[in-house]
Amino acid sequence: MQTLTIIRPDDMHLHLRDGDALKAVAPYTARQMGRAVIMPNLKPPVVSVADALAYKARIMAALPEGSAFEPLMTLYLTDQATPALVREAKAAGIVAFKLYPAGATTNSDSGVTDLFKLIPVLEEMAKQGILFLVHGEVTDPEIDIFDREAAFIGRVMKPVLAQVPNLKVVFEHITTAEAARLVLEAGDNVAATVTPQHLLLNRNDLLVGGVRPHHFCLPVLKRETHRQALVAAVTGEKAHKFFLGTDSAPHAKSAKENACGCAGMFSAMTAIELYAEVFEKAGALDKLEAFASKNGARFYGIPENTDTITLVKQSQTVPASIPYGDGELVPMRAGGEIGWTVQY
């Protein structure tokens, strides 16, 4: 039977929620990943160092006994952010600030309205070596939802990189050929995370044969040509600029199967197996370890994990749902098969 042993991976873009939801989902990430970069879009958002440290304590309390998993904490960037906050965050071990353009995604109401007014804050991030994590979509109502990432590149990303050229930027959960091209052409201070859904699915999987609410995420799934461009990027010559970030974003089944359903896919349960499928299909299984376990750590300036995990070429059936607080949660590929299984 084919096996693949790799350095334990890290999830560089994860939503863990809070309360009972946190307790339901954290163990799934902790059994696969050594570390994860924790997104700060709670209600209310994680905007202060005290918020982040309190949230980290709640995450640690939700982990299985004996778990070595480490959450890497971030702050939610707001219009009120200051260079002093950046310095305080750095001193407290916060790894990054996350940009949510106001209204772009779940719990982004407190997001930034004009990033260019925060240039002094971004300059301080560059000085302190704190990363800038970007949800790269414009929110103007006149811009088509399928074009919002591409529009963001010209309107925001390129001008910001020109003004703060040494800022370390992660273009999060990229979904388009344009975003991949930007990262490929930018300096080594610019990298990107890529989700399993954007490597495996296209917008037909969302809309053909009926609306599939469990395939609805933001940024929304794009054309097949974009999916192919992402696969080419993560397996190509400059693959070191791309790394694993699931954007696993749990919502109760009742909130997804809804007249106005929530955006987000829960992939943490079988994340590394889904990525293995991508790399296997691309004939690039030998590049999975760098994507999952090396590139992100290097970009963040942290050591690689010292232990390993082993994947077996053995099919598994993903559960139709799992308990989630008072309700249930539908994982990615629910009820379907994945050709790889992690040996726990």
UniProtKB/Swiss-Prot annotation:
UniProt keywords, alphabetically: Hydrolase, Metal-binding, Pyrimidine biosynthesis, Zinc
InterPro entries: Amidohydro-rel, DHOdimr, Dihydroorotase_CS, Metal_Hydrolase
Listed Gene3D superfamilies: Metal-dependent hydrolases
Bilayer-spanning residue ranges: none
Binding site for Zn(2+) 1: H13, H15, K98, D247
First-level EC class: hydrolase
Free-text cofactor note: Binds 2 Zn(2+) ions per subunit.
HAMAP family recorded: PyrC_classII
Recorded GO CC terms: cytoplasm
Recorded name of the encoding gene: pyrC
Keyword set includes Zinc: yes
The organism of origin for this protein: Neisseria meningitidis serogroup A / serotype 4A (strain DSM 15465 / Z2491)
Residue numbers binding substrate: H15, L16, R17, N41, H135, L218, H251, A263
Quaternary data: Homodimer.
Protein name listed in UniProt: Dihydroorotase
Known role: Catalyzes the reversible cyclization of carbamoyl aspartate to dihydroorotate.
Record bears the keyword Iron: no
Residue numbers carrying N6-carboxylysine: K98
Active site: D247
Binding of Zn(2+) 2, residues: K98, H135, H173
Catalytic activity: (S)-dihydroorotate + H2O = N-carbamoyl-L-aspartate + H(+)
Gene Ontology terms, MF aspect: dihydroorotase activity; zinc ion binding
